[in-house]
């Protein structure tokens, strides 16, 4: 199987860290379960200037390296690799975040996973002149059998793969979303994802 895995809020608990950061920077307390929007400026009620500062801080190397692993992520990823599956981590983080992101993967036992920074969300506004290691035209040439993703904003990047099975990692901001089709399956944790792959691997 060729497997696509998103980084933030699939491999690590990014939103929980941003909730702590919102308290630290702006005194805004939004419990994790109340983060109803993928757009963090809406969830934390930030103006444009605050949002830019917030995202810049959240992408500093020491902050990225501090994100906690989502339970079970590295174990399942390494099981897949050991079983011969081809795993690519494709993140919407800018390329300026590549090195700390790569180090985070390595530090959490995922040294053999490929990492790509794809311009998923047009986030150049908060890190000026940022580059991405994977352009959309090249991404669309890639083929996957299964994807692990939490963001409804990313679902459009799967439309070129009609047979793709998408494991939607359950998060507060995707619970009210209507899935595009029956290939999208809500998963509450990595054990559920592991079970699905084990049962459907050829």
Spans of features found by a protein language model:
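Residues at alpha-helix termini
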Residues: 24-25, 82, 107, 160
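Short, basic/glycine-rich phosphate-binding loops at helix/coil junctions
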Residues: 43-60, 114
